[in-house]
């Protein structure tokens, strides 16, 4: 190497050291991929760049991988360890390029030694992530590269793709050199998709986008209808449409995203003790394959918008366009959110055809353009910590967009977002007690920022993806008959759409719940809320935490949820550090208590994971209430109850999977010595498992009471409608709350019964057993529930019903 070259490389090394700070994608690539760093590794990169090569060298050495600038030595032969794909061009009879010659040398090595297995490692280096137009050339000259690295070098990523075995390629395609060209074509497509999945496409500027939308047939017709119905001029209708487009459309700014990355990075590090991400690689692979990704997260907090975008950015994925409620479009948050990708949606479209047409057209533009999109299927934030009944409007538009343009392969990604501390939880409990929701504004935002401390850990779990085309193929085999050209005016509303959207929304909710994150706060809250007087000694609480952890780790397996790998002692110490519990030391053992004022708040965190413990809690309750019961009878009773619980709690198991899950859970409770199996009958293990089993069972006490109220009323009023049933259920729950001295406003809150009853009535036919009529099935379910709740509660319900019946009889007589 000449002195001039040495000076150039040394200068480049120094520049990279000072100005480049790269992040590895995926974060734990070497361990997750199972790559053997001692094996011969050959790097391929998209395009010729010495700077990219040096950045790759720095990252490779950090990860313990071979230096790409050190030649590969095999049988005393030295060959360069890297190749640029853009150097491979089909020669068509001309002399082969140096890249082709290099690849042929690798083929020659294999022909001499067939046991040699060289690993091809595709790598792309990305400096900055400014979205580009699809027709824009990504190649830049050296000077442009220098200034890009100088300005954006701290925002660099090194993407390692899945390793490829050279021997497998040769065995599959022989040693024909033409395979080089095929590999180059495949690699170019892969690198381009990887680039798009990380950076995303740039939306047209507002003026061009609005012009395109206004020229569509659907909006032109809506403008004519607007002018005619409101008796205004076409120009006025046109101005109204522009105003609505400006209200809706996002205005993504890469510089704002880059700045927010710095601010959010500082905030997460200062106020959170860690952000845990699970199953992101599945999403990344789908994006690399060209899928149009739609993120469908649960909604716990306003922090969800920021957290998910931040996580995606750090996972090397393009930040999505986010459907945000119009209530967040206040100064200055609205403008910031808009630049971060938010587009704003009104709560209600009814009566405003122009708005709904424009919003649908804007959403179509996002879907057909392949932009990642995010919307909250619950519509609003959950005040109880439970998943809300899904809102299906935007989901329906997603399917309709695909029916207008089948080309994008849309995949829905359910996302579970969890926190150890939700900053709005205090206001949620106030709203449950009847206080009015405060309107979001600048001063409320400042007040919220003041609460940013001791936030614990955050969790983002990506659930099982749902590929729309595959889902429709399975559930609506003839759906392709409903596809029509994109320039048609009317929205596509095939006869199957409404029912399919409802079922799909329900499946999304199941997949969100199935990806739950288990942490110290929700586990400790679950145990203490289920205990007598909301207090346990330290050994008792540790025993209960261990029971929960073992149940979730051993039976049944779930690849989408995340269970902490910490020991119960570590979990408890962390939970106590969060200052949500009180430790009483004037006791033989430390006593951990929930202060009275914390009880409503802790219900929120308990509710986040309660669905994961429904089945083991049902088993525990059944064993405790029946004292001596066969495995078959436990399975029979829970199988009858399961459809009712599945509906509201969005439980994952099908009827076929349920039997296996129940057997695994029962075996686990035997292994933990909570129950004993005597002559094929289950009894409580009085010597060691009584208290653990009682607390486990107590976790669903309120749920069983809710269901008992509903099914009691369904047995005495067979023809009752949904609205009346909700009213009567709430009244009876309130009455029981007073008699049983239960202070929880959540027990009889309208949101509990409203969502539950809506889903029950929608899925009523799925509750019916093959052996029973609908009413007989309801009576059988109530008979099982009667055996699982206190006889005192049954007496109170019957007495309440008798008094009401007498009152109605008396009222009728006096009226007559």
UniProtKB/Swiss-Prot annotation:
Pathway: Phospholipid metabolism; CDP-diacylglycerol biosynthesis; CDP-diacylglycerol from sn-glycerol 3-phosphate: step 1/3. It is found in: Cell membrane. It is a peripheral membrane protein. One of its GO terms (cellular component) is plasma membrane. Its EC number is 2.3.1.15. GO terms for biological process: CDP-diacylglycerol biosynthetic process; fatty acid metabolic process. It catalyses: sn-glycerol 3-phosphate + an acyl-CoA = a 1-acyl-sn-glycero-3-phosphate + CoA. InterPro entries: GPAT/DHAPAT (IPR022284), GPAT/DHAPAT_C (IPR045520), GPAT/DHAPAT_LPLAT (IPR041728), GPAT_PlsB (IPR028354), Plipid/glycerol_acylTrfase (IPR002123). A motif (HXXXXD motif) lies at residues 298-303. The HXXXXD motif is essential for acyltransferase activity and may constitute the binding site for the phosphate moiety of the glycerol-3-phosphate. Belongs to the GPAT/DAPAT family. This is Glycerol-3-phosphate acyltransferase. It comes from Hamiltonella defensa subsp. Acyrthosiphon pisum (strain 5AT). The gene is plsB.
């Amino acid at each position: 190497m000449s002195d001039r070259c040495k000076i150039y490389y040394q200068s480049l090394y120094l520049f990279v050291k000072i100005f480049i700070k790269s992040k590895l994608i995926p974060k734990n690539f070497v361990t997750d991929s199972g790559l053997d760093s001692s094996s011969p590794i050959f790097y391929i990169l998209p395009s010729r760049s010495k700077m990219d090569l040096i950045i790759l060298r720095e990252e490779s050495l950090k990860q313990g991988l071979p230096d790409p600038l050190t030649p590969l030595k095999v049988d005393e032969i030295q060959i360069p360890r890297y190749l640029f794909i853009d150097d491979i061009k089909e020669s068509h009879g001309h002399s082969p390029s140096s890249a082709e010659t290099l690849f042929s040398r690798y083929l020659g090595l294999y022909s001499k030694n067939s046991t040699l297995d060289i690993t091809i490692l595709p790598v792309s280096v990305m400096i900055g992530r400014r979205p580009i137009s699809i027709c824009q050339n990504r190649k830049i000259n050296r000077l442009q590269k220098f200034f890009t690295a100088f300005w954006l070098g701290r925002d660099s990523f090194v993407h390692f793709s899945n390793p490829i075995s050279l021997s497998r390629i040769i065995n599959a395609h022989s040693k024909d050199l033409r395979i080089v060209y095929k590999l180059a074509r495949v690699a170019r497509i892969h690198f381009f998709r990887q680039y798009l999945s990380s950076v995303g496409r740039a939306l047209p500027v507002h003026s061009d986008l609005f012009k395109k939308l206004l020229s569509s047939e659907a909006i032109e017709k809506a403008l004519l209808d607007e002018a005619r119905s409101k008796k205004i001029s076409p120009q006025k209708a046109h101005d109204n449409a522009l105003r609505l487009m400006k209200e809706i459309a996002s205005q993504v700014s890469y510089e704002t995203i880059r700045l927010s990355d710095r601010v959010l990075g500082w905030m997460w590090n200062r106020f959170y003790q860690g952000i845990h991400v699970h199953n992101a690689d599945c999403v990344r692979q789908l994006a690399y394959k060209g899928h149009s990704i739609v993120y469908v997260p649960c909604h716990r907090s306003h922090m969800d918008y920021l957290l998910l975008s931040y996580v995606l950015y750090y996972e090397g994925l393009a930040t999505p366009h986010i459907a945000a409620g119009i209530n967040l479009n206040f100064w200055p948050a609205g403008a910031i959110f808009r630049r971060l990708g938010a587009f704003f949606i009104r709560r209600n479209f009814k009566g405003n055809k122009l708005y709904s047409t424009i919003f649908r057209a804007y959403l179509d533009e996002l879907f057909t353009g392949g932009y990642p999109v995010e919307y909250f299927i619950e519509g609003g934030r959950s005040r109880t910590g439970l998943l809300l009944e899904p809102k299906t409007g935007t989901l329906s538009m997603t399917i309709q967009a695909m029916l207008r343009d089948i080309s994008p392969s849309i995949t829905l990604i359910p996302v579970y977002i969890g926190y150890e501390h939700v900053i709005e939880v205090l206001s949620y409990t106030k709203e449950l007690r009847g206080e009015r929701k405060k309107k979001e504004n600048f001063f409320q935002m400042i007040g919220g920022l003041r609460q940013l401390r001791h936030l614990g850990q955050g969790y983002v779990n990506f659930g099982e993806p749902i590929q729309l085309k595959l889902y429709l193929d399975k559930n609506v085999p003839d759906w392709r008959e409903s596809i029509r050209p994109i320039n048609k005016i009317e929205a596509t509303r095939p006869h199957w759409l409404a029912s399919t959207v409802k079922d799909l929304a329900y499946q999304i909710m199941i997949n969100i719940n199935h990806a739950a994150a288990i942490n110290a706060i929700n586990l400790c809250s679950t145990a203490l809320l289920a205990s007598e007087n909301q207090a346990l000694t330290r050994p008792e609480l540790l025993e209960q935490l261990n029971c929960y952890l073992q149940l979730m780790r051993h039976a049944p397996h779930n690849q989408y949820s995340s269970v902490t790998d910490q020991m119960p002692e570590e979990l408890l110490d962390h939970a106590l550090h969060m200052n949500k519990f009180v430790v009483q030391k004037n006791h033989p053992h430390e006593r951990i208590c929930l202060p009275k004022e914390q009880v409503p708040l802790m219900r929120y965190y308990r509710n986040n994971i309660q669905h994961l413990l429904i089945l083991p809690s049902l088993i525990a309750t059944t064993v405790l209430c029946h004292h001596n019961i066969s495995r078959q009878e436990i399975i029979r009773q829970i199988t009858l109850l399961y459809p009712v619980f599945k509906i509201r709690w969005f439980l994952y198991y099908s009827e076929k999977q349920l039997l296996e899950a129940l057997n695994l859970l029962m075996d686990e409770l035997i292994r933990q010595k909570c129950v004993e199996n005597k002559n094929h009958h289950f009894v409580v293990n009085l010597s060691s498992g009584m208290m653990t089993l009682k607390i486990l069972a107590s976790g669903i006490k309120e749920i069983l009471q809710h269901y008992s109220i509903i099914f009691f009323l369904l047995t005495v009023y067979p023809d009752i409608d949904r609205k009346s049933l909700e009213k009567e259920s709430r009244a009876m729950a309130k009455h029981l709350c007073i008699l049983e001295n239960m202070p929880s406003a959540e027990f009889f809150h309208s949101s509990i019964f409203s969502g539950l009853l809506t889903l029950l009535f929608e899925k009523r036919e799925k509750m019916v057993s093959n052996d029973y009529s609908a009413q007989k099935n309801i009576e059988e379910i109530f008979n099982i529930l009667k055996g699982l709740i206190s006889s005192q509660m049954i007496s109170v319900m019957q007495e309440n019903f008798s008094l009401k019946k007498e009152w109605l009889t008396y009222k009728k007589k006096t009226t007559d």
